[in-house]
Design a protein with these regions (language model features):
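Long, highly charged, low-complexity intrinsically disordered interaction regions
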Residues: 1-93
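Short, flexible N-terminal segments of the mature chain
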Residues: 33-34, 124-126
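Charged catalytic cores and adjacent phosphate/nucleic-acid-binding surfaces used
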Residues: 74, 79-98, 116-121, 127, ...
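Ser/Thr-glycine-rich phosphate-binding loops at phosphate-binding pockets of nucleotides
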Residues: 103-109, 130-134
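Core AdoMet radical
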Residues: 132-133, 174-176
Length: 340
């Protein structure tokens, strides 16, 4: 077995299982080190016992490399594959089978843990036809939000990758902060160049309900906004975080009127919106995007978690934009932009 493939697969499965970042990083670092060695060097180092003298290779990763080069599936990988056979959820499989893409993922250009190429390649490998790269906007400095200049650089990187990846498409996008007044945290000219714009609240989450409603309605009514991300901002694990307060019926009605999709965020610590609000968004006639908000390749597998919640709450599959082809998705967003 190729040792790089073994190390990367272990990292993917650890991410899927919500392992600590430091554990995942050890395997991705080791994969990069081994991938950079000259032909035959890894075999030589296994033979003479010098593998662990390489920076970035420890006892655990050295063992995986040795087993892989010996022609075996590493024991640690076998164990993780066995654990991954258990489904993440008890439902959601029917909708998950219809999905073609994911509108919300991050790279190490902002607060993600992996390069753009790794995220795109992982999306391909799990069967997606397309995925949208949505790194953060400038104001979210804690997440290394992209300045206009860095976003322009990223567009060029994505264009280069797409030349090599066809027919898979990595679509350009952003997770754009909704500012206090409901305006969007990026230059309009740049937003017009993007394929998909996810808009999210990341600040003043405890704003007065009336003000938060005005803020969100203004944002989702903007023709440059395509998806409303994690609408309540809640966190349901760890120390947790309460939901932002707003008039959900008014916000979802505005989404339906503007053709802006409500995100069903699949991250286990978010599960946003809550079921009671998700059902109200269905009643409002809104579109939906079942997204992972992935910050690492293995987290792309979490989409079934959102699919289960969508099925439980009666979300019609035809109103889920992540079931659409890339062409249909882009027609939708371009038609929205034409009203700008």
């Amino acid at each position: 077995m190729d040792p790089v493939e073994a190390l990367e697969r272990i990292a993917f499965l650890l991410e899927r299982g919500r392992a600590p970042t430091y554990r995942v990083r050890a395997f991705r670092t080791a994969a990069a080190v081994v991938g950079g060695l000259a032909d035959g060097e890894a075999v030589r180092r296994v033979a003479d016992g010098s593998l662990e003298s390489l920076k970035g290779i420890g006892p655990k990763t050295a063992g995986v490399i040795s087993e892989a080069l010996g022609g075996d599936v590493p024991g640690y990988l076998q164990r993780l594959e066995g654990e991954a056979e258990a489904p993440l959820t008890g439902g959601g499989a029917e909708l998950r089978a219809l999905l073609r893409g994911d509108c919300h993922l991050h790279s190490d250009w902002s607060d993600g843990g992996s390069p753009i190429e790794e995220m795109g390649r992982a999306a391909q490998e799990i069967g997606h036809e397309w995925a949208v790269l949505t790194d953060h906007s400038p104001r979210l400095t804690i997440a290394r939000g992209l300045s206009p200049e860095r976003l322009r650089e990223q567009l060029a990187v994505v264009a280069d990758l797409n030349e090599r990846w066809a027919p898979f498409r990595l679509l350009t996008g952003i997770e754009c902060d909704i500012l206090d007044d409901g305006s969007l945290d990026q230059e309009p000219e740049l937003l017009d160049r993007l394929d998909v714009v996810v808009v999210s609240v990341h600040s003043k989450l405890r704003m007065d309900a009336a003000a938060m409603t005005r803020r969100m309605v203004a944002a989702v009514s903007n023709p440059r906004a395509d998806v409303l991300g994690h609408c309540t901002g809640r966190l349901v694990t760890g120390r947790g975080r309460p939901e932002s307060q707003f008039d959900a019926d008014e916000v979802f009605a505005a989404c339906a009127a503007a053709g802006t999709a409500v995100e069903i965020n699949s991250r286990p610590e978010r599960l946003d919106p809550p079921r009671r609000l998700l059902r109200r968004a269905v009643d409002a006639g809104a579109l939906f995007a079942v997204d992972t908000d992935a910050h690492a390749p293995g987290q792309l597998d979490w989409q079934v978690i959102g699919c289960e919640r969508a099925e439980e709450c009666g979300v019609p599959a035809e109103r889920v934009v992540t079931t659409w082809t890339a062409e249909k998705l882009l027609t939708w967003t371009r038609e929205k932009r034409s009203a700008a």
